[in-house]
Amino acid sequence: MSKRVSAFGAEGDDEPQEKPMKPFISFSSNINNNNNSNNNNNNNNNNNNNNNNNNNKNNIGTGINLNIKNNNNINNNNNKSGFPVKKSRFNGEDDDDDYFFSNVPPKSSMTTLNKSPPNFENASSNNNNNNNNNNQESDSKNQNEDEDDEIDPLDAFMENVNAQAAIDNSKSIEKGQQQQQSLKSKRDDIDNEDDEEIFYKLRQKQLANKSSKQQQDDDVDYSSLDDDDGYFDDEESLKNGQSKGKRIIEPLPPIDHSKEEYIEFNKIFYEEHPDIANLTEEQVFEIRKNLDIRMTGTDLINPVTSFGHYGFDDILLQAIAKQSIETPTPIQKQAIPIALSGRDLIAIAKTGSGKTATFIWPSISHIMDQPYLEKGDGPIALFLAPTRELAHQIYLETLKYSKYFKLKTTVLYGGVSKQQQCKELKAGCEIIVATPGRLIDMIKLKATKLNRVSYLVLDEADKMFDFGFGPQVLSIVNHVRPDRQTLLFSATFKPNVEEFARTILSDPIKISIGMIGSANSDITQIVQVLKSDSDKWNWLTNQLALLLSQGSVLIFVSTKVAVEQLSSNLTKFGFQTCTLHGDKNQIERSQTIQTFKEGKINILIATDVAARGLDIPLIKNVVNYDTSRDIESHTHRIGRTGRAGNTGVAYTLITPKDIHFSVDLIKNLESASQFVPPELIDVAMNNPHFKRERGGGGGGSNRGRGRGGGGVGYRRNSRGGGVAFNSNRDSSRSDSQNKFIPAQSVEGGRLFNPNNTDNSEINNENEKSINNENKFSNNNSGSSNDRNSINYRNNSFNNNSNNTNNSGNSNFNNSNSNNGYSNNNYNNNYKNNSNYNNSNNNNNSYYNNNNSNNNNNSNYNNSSNNNNNNNNNYRNGNNNNNYNNNNYYNNNNSNNNSSNNNNSNNNSSNNNFNNNFNNNNNNNDNSNFNRALPFNDFNNNNNNSNNNNFNYNNNFNNSYNANNSNHYKNNNNSNNFNQRSQYNRR
């Protein structure tokens, strides 16, 4: 049944009709009548009979509901109008008629209608008649009167209705348009006054006020720089019309692990190699000491010395070889066995030491042992990083190895479309690298979950807590299954952060490589003390061309304004630069880094936003145009060069105003055996505390008074004189409690070499047969004492040291001539070792003798004239020092000559070593000896023949000539170790 359409729109229409329909008149059968009992021709279905009333209500179908009362008495016996009464125009659609006519507004009287002439244009006929009541007796018949042709009230009413309908229609259309406009403006108002947006704006304003009090345009505050997804995404900021500001990240709600179902997994994949298992405690101790490793914890695991000891799959070993990695770094030698053993770990190592690969390689073994992901599962390995740059760097490093095992890896950080990241997560991935805030967003959006995570890594964990991500990180960790494996890595680790980290770890092993927060010894630090800031510009413009000839240059400044200003000045000076700071969005940052990495532009000027996570091998020089806020940031700045065993140079420009930073910088230089310019010490002397520690009086007491030469150091002892550094600390104490034990330096000496002094102490413990003079001369390879070692490396800065250094070489030659051997301590020890034929004693002798050298591993390289490893030789003062030909150290020629004469008197140290080695190998099981050597990677086979030993020494002298494939394969063949087969995932 179709519905009628009214002039104003039928029920259910969305919009009113613009034109009214033509009115019609219908005598519907659905009429409510109040009739007399004498009504004979009333066919209505709904009749209400009243004995006292004789009123007939007429229904008029006009397209509008009407209810008109007629006060006249109407006799319905005869209808003379000519229109049918019982049959409606719509064939008796009573329900529709009743619906439309039920809401007709009542009219008081027909006399109130307009008396104007009727308009019959839209009327089908005139169906209203005025009847007269004859008031006759009750038994007489009712008679109908003729129509009143003068004025028809119905016509007048219809005309008024049509006019009113047109007016109402126009008003309705106008009102609809106003409502639409009102709704549109109202939605805009809601968007502008969104509660969440108001909260964010208020919070942003509060943070801005707080930040303005603490810092004026200082980029060093990471919480305002890194946009590390604790911030609005760029797309969200533009959408809401907001400037970039810190966003409040609510931690994840707690989770009840007892209600979760977790699959079983294995996290122990390490089987100790026989060569490592056979090492004695003394040998393990010496290996750790040589690698400068300190460990605390229970059930400590021995370090390895080669890749073959890990038990990695051949595919992973080949992937490592393709990266031109020849030997593990110190942290990799100790931390990877711990990670493969399923233990929780706290690892502290200097920047550029290979921390990233340390947790990536074990993660692949961990993942490949587990079942495949099912639909809806989250990742198996989760790597958290504080900044987007570091997260992206870890992601790229992970791809280098995961692609060979078809493991899907995804990175999550702010500034990237959430929609795309959700799509990648829902497709499934085994490894996620993420910043805490964006990961929380993805979990709340149900794009991923942490039900499968069993391998959790927090890189730069201390900075995550420093940035205020502690609650967020803790909530993420609490969403991971309790029996997970957790590893924390950082270049620095403050005691309060360490205490917090231990709450999320289970029986961890803590290892630290070198001094906590120390600089990388592969990086040469050169400090330039200038009179004023204006001198910095002159120095930079004079040196920049030379620095660019060596490779790309990274320049650090302290503020965003300074970045743009320095870039503009260098551009005017003819240099092409690119910039990186906190105001750059993610797209601009990525483009800048990519341009710099490809070498299209060789100068990058940046704030500390680039101090972490930027790994570009082309960077050969770092210039600290402005000093960093603290020494930790300085360590990360200079760590952008000299990465993964490569060498680099870092220049730091100091002015007299940098008093407090100079104090920390001196300690940093000393910890890495770097030269400390006297001018830098003069600046630091303006610090009262530093002056009390190292000031001029020398020292009979802790107050710096008494006789003896004034010196610099960490503490003074009761013997007076200068002081030296001793890093042999009790590992049972915390790092904050460890103190530096001074040692006596030469009379009047002001500088010292911490590493050499430390080695001399080791020699006192392990080699009583060699006097102190010999120990110093052997360690320094051409110096008679500690002071001369520093002068040998840096006498271009202090000409007065040359004479002393030459005298040191003279003493060195006399010492060696008495012994009849060259400058290799192990030659003397092999000569004097009566128990050489005993393999166990031989191992002990090897390590004890090796301690007398400045750097055990580099001694092998330095002893080899074929290595030409100039950078390492420079570190250890070898005769083949590349820097001897440089202007920096051109005064060392006399030292080298004396060393060369010494070598000629001894008929070549290497040949002496080989002869002694072969002569003492009669009837000896040399396989045990070779297993103890850290370079047994290069042994082809372990035989008992003297010929093989001679070949070993040849390989030893030319160790780096072996290619990578032989490096790994030969090691596996020599040990006959049962390697695990290819990974078979369940």
Curated annotation (Swiss-Prot):
Q: Where is this region: Disordered?
A: 1-149, 165-192, 206-252, 688-986
Reported EC number(s) for this entry are 3.6.4.13
Q: Where is the composition biased (Polar residues)?
A: 105-117
CC terms in the record's Gene Ontology section:
nucleus
Molecular function in Gene Ontology = ATP binding; ATP hydrolysis activity; RNA binding; RNA helicase activity
Query: What CDD domains does this protein's entry cite?
Result: DEADc_DDX42 (cd17952), SF2_C_DEAD (cd18787)
Q: Where is this motif: DEAD box?
A: 459-462
Q: Where is the composition biased (Acidic residues)?
A: 217-236
Residues in domain Helicase ATP-binding? 336-511
Residue ranges, compositional bias (Gly residues): 696-723
- What does the sequence similarity comment in the record state about its family? Belongs to the DEAD box helicase family. DDX42 subfamily.
- Descriptive protein name: Probable ATP-dependent RNA helicase ddx42
Organism field: Dictyostelium discoideum (Social amoeba)
Q: Quote the gene name from the UniProt entry.
A: ddx42
